[in-house]
Amino acid sequence: MTVTSSAAIDIGGGGGGRRSDRLDSDRTSEDMSFIASPANESFQIGASFVDVQNESSGSIDTATATLHELNYTFGMPPVTEESENMPQNYETVVELLPGEERAPINKLTEFPIEGGSLFVTNFRIVVILKDKEVEEALRFLVFPLQDIEQIDLAIPAFIHLSLKIGRMFTICFKTAEDAALVHKILYTAFQRLNRPISSIYTSRPQDWTSKNTDNPMQSLNAFAWKFSEAVDELDRDGKLPSWLLRADSVAQEITHIDFNRLGMSEHFQISSVNENFEVCPTYPEKIIVPKGITDDDIRKGAPYRSIGRFPAVIWRCRKTRAVLMRSSQPQVGILSWRNPTDEKIIEEAVKASRIEGEEKKQFIIMDARGYTSAFANRARSGGFENTEYYQQAKLEFLGLPNIHAVRGSFNNVRTMLHNLGPNEQLLTSLQTTGWLLNLSNLLVNAANCADHLSKGHSVLVHCSDGWDRTTQVTTLAKIMLDEYYRTVKGFEELIRRDWIAFGHKLYDRQLVAFGNWGTSDERSPVFLQFLEAVRHLQREQPTLFQFTHAYLIKLAKHAYSGLFGSFLFNSHKERREAMEKCKGTLVDIWRFIGPHNEEYVNQSFDEHYTGAVKPVNVSVINLRVWHEVFADEEEHYTQIFSPKEERPLSGCTTPMNTSTSTNLVKSKSSESINSLNVDGSAKESSQQHPTCSTTPSDNTNSLPMSTSFIQQSLYQPKVRGVAAIDRDGVIRFEDDEQAMLRKKNKLRAEEIRRKDEKIEELRRRAVLDTNKVSPGQRQSYSESDVETTGTLERVMSDVSMVDPVNELPHFKPNTTWEGESGHCAYCKKEFNKLSVYVEDRQHHCRNCGRVVCEDCSKNRFSVIEEGKSVQKRACDSCYDSMHETDLKLSSSSTTTTSSSTKIENDSNVPGLDNNSDNVSENVSENAIPDIIVEEKEAEDPIKEAESPSKETKCPKTLRNFISFSPKSSMRKNKVHSRDPLKSIDEGSSSQQAESDDVLDVNEQPL
């Protein structure tokens, strides 16, 4: 076919002039890179071609190329590339959450960075690091927008991220303009998500839109609202995500659960005095109080405590009846005020724990502050209790650090982990942070509280406001004492009631205050410190906790992610008001990490263990930093402690060295806390954000070429690619030990299921077979009744071991066994020959040979076989006859009687010839004849018997009296013990008795 074409198009420079000067018909040229354009525009060509315009200008940047794809028909829209330097608009396959949308950056949904790309949504920042050789996404990094604590722009093209959960990262861009553009968008989101809670809910949070291409984050709100709206819509359409439970699966009222479980109805009651949050705005709607306290008493006593947080009962020891209470500091003031109603509430609660007739135990008041701090608060109408006003009271000061000291130590440990100095200074740097020391003090005081309760002392715990250190101490003590709170369901109720319902300021503790929104910074990782303390207990005693390490990590991440509504408010009151204004609902995290999710259930949990935890070493030397949370999820623990010069640097890295260069552009002023620390600790120093001093191109060879494969693998993620992102949109934590245990348990459960199905199939077939086959036609021989044929030497060895003195009294060896029978010889019970259960099968008495059932042959007698005592089955009739001691025969008469009986029995068996060396082939219908050992089987000389009497060799004629079982299995002679009568209960093993038939060997007197 001939194609009319125009002049050839030049698609690249080269020697020999322009390709357009050549003719299309010139097929002899080796350079076939030119592609002709057809003159007929409606003609469909079979190859791709490129139309280059503005080529004559001589500038590559101004030239444009139009790519016409395979089988192109003229008139189709072309693919145009203006410049080879222009970034392509492609999207990495990352599954978005319900309600999640990508925000365009410079009209691109995926923005290029050094070593990969990133994209931003209304929930998170996703960084994709790729392999340049294979263009494969090797690693994904996820940063929830609400988790960002600080975002800084650094010269030449860096963005530093500090996260509230403790991680720090540096993103490297190709140009400074790209870094500034992304920083502007992220900083707007940072401002929007750190507004005071009072200014957030003036409009509907669901109104976020990404249509504003200049800055799509100008109307951003917490993603939890958009996520909940999308999930509710999917639920109505029947398309709820499989990893989420329905909303009604989470109990709304949890106070009654503990009240009923602990049996508190006798002395306590649930009060609804705070139903509308009028008494205390930070307390839950329902509170447990003593029965002797009325609602009016609570209203009168609440103002005496700071913010109205009066003493409330939160737990009771079922063993000692001791009560655990919580409150805020009393309003004592300089004049030492007192309140009789407050004293009455405490007295009634303590009275319920005292047992009449026993010695009264002391009432312990644990003030989480130090004495100096508590005394200084008296100037602000605060203070501590006067023990003279409370019966048998004792006051203890715990000296735990306040939120500012906790925040300072957390910042120090975060900086230390991501900006390590020489390895020899590691322990010194860690000690300087004070983080592990604070953690140890918290665990020690919680253990002391648990010890008081276990000894029967009722305890009241409070600090200044009663929602930070108070919550930490009380919840840790409850975990140490009550096994229920160490389960997934119990730990969920503990968080929901003691932390969320009792008003821990979860939102304010993660809020970054800046600008004109307030001078006081209340952010502090109090909840994160509590989770790390629980992690230490779990690491010390892993079998006592039903939830896994991954469960705690997921809680820590979503406490700051903004995905779930569980941690977005300071109290129940704020959540209720926000939901009323927004007319929406929120998804709780418990719909995701409940006990229904096997990933968060410990496979080695000991569910039978009850009571308090075993003694735990809580000293500083036994603690370690929670690296899985504070550092990168996919870094191995060894990377943090490796030399800096051996660490690979990529497009998104952890800062490696500290720099004081002025190139760092701070987007917010450095933090400086100069307020008085009443606990006596030092001022909190301002934090300088670390930077990277070199660009990625300068460090491409930072990993030595001689590094082994094992060393290089330390820097690789455990899970490569998009599989590292979990269903909730954050990086998955891989617990290899739990994964292995889950696999083993699944295989075990599958094996049990298959065996159950097999048993059920056998039962079904047995029922069908019973209905089809008559009892007279059924013939079955148990495998236990079949024995392999032994040699003559072994038989003769058994014969030589016969000791007539030790034979059983009144024992009648049988030569004929009853054949197959459909019922028991005594109780006439029908047998099921296909049943796998011993109770439904037939058995033979090893004395008389009758066919009996399990119920009629529960007794056993003992014999000696090969020097070992073996239990044999006996029917009830034979067993009773064995107890007739008056019929006991002498050893000689027993031997004679046994021999004569054998001769008489053998003479009556069809086909048996005592004078012949051959086996008779006459087989009756109901009996199988005995088999006589032929003379050729004794080719080897018969060994001398190992008898004490040193008998001579057995004569040749003896072989005629060595008989075998009617079922063609050779019978061994039994040597019986002197004490043969032994009864075993029904639970003993009957398998041995089933498999060992009595082998009768009788010696003919010569």
Swiss-Prot record:
A 1,2-diacyl-sn-glycero-3-phospho-(1D-myo-inositol-3,5-bisphosphate) binds at N377, N402, I403, S464, D465, G466, W467, D468, R469, K505, R509. It comes from the Eukaryota. Residues 651-705 have a biased composition (Polar residues). Residues 1-10, 890-901, 913-926 have a biased composition (Low complexity). The keyword Hydrolase applies. Its main location: cytoplasm. GO terms for cellular component: cytoplasm; membrane. It is a peripheral membrane protein. Zn(2+) 1 binds at C824, C827, C853, C856. It is found in: Cytoplasm; Membrane. A zinc finger (FYVE-type) spans 818-883. One of its GO terms (biological process) is negative regulation of engulfment of apoptotic cell. Keywords: Cytoplasm, Developmental protein, Hydrolase, Lipid metabolism, Lipid-binding, Membrane, Metal-binding, Zinc, Zinc-finger. Expressed in the body wall muscle and in eggs. Expressed in head neurons. Expressed in the intestine. Expressed in pharyngeal cells, vulval muscle cells and cells of the tail region. GO terms for molecular function: inositol bisphosphate phosphatase activity; lipid binding; phosphatidylinositol trisphosphate phosphatase activity; phosphatidylinositol-3,5-bisphosphate 3-phosphatase activity; phosphatidylinositol-3,5-bisphosphate phosphatase activity; phosphatidylinositol-3-phosphate phosphatase activity; protein tyrosine phosphatase activity; zinc ion binding. Its EC number is 3.1.3.95. Residues 1-29, 641-705, 886-1006 are annotated as: Disordered. The active site is at C463. Disruption phenotype: Worms exhibit a 2-fold increase in PI3P, sluggish body movement with progressive deterioration and defects in gestation. Residues 224-630 form the Myotubularin phosphatase domain. Interacts with phosphatidylinositol 3-phosphate (PI3P) via the FYVE-type domain. Belongs to the protein-tyrosine phosphatase family. Non-receptor class myotubularin subfamily. This is Phosphatidylinositol-3,5-bisphosphate 3-phosphatase MTMR3. It comes from Caenorhabditis elegans.
